Amino acid sequence: MKFMLNATGLPLQDLVFGASVYFPPFFKAFAFGFVIWLVVHRLLRGWIYAGDIWHPLLMDLSLFAICVCLALAILIAW
């Protein structure tokens, strides 16, 4: 049995191509940012939860967003 898929002219051709090209770099930045966040969170955990920060969860989320942006910048520069 021979399976041949010719996707030319299909409306989702660009969507599938775009997802396969543009999703992996963001996923790499997300995963690398998570690793950076784990290290930074471990270093700053005592200060964040000591009461100096008004809302520790928002601080954690902000640090995570900064780490993902930093990881994306590192991946772009590399």
From Swiss-Prot:
- Sequence intervals crossing the membrane: 20-40, 57-77
Compartment annotation: Cell membrane
Entry keyword Transmembrane helix: yes
Q: Which UniProt keywords apply?
A: Cell membrane, Membrane, Transmembrane, Transmembrane helix
Its membrane topology: Multi-pass membrane protein
Q: Cross-referenced Pfam families, in alphabetical order?
A: DUF1656
Transmembrane found in the keyword field: yes
Taxonomy of the source species: Bacteria, Pseudomonadati, Pseudomonadota, Gammaproteobacteria, Enterobacterales
> Superkingdom of this entry's organism?
Bacteria
**UniProt name for this protein:** Uncharacterized protein YdhI
InterPro entries on file:
DUF1656
User: Would you name any one GO CC term?
Assistant: plasma membrane
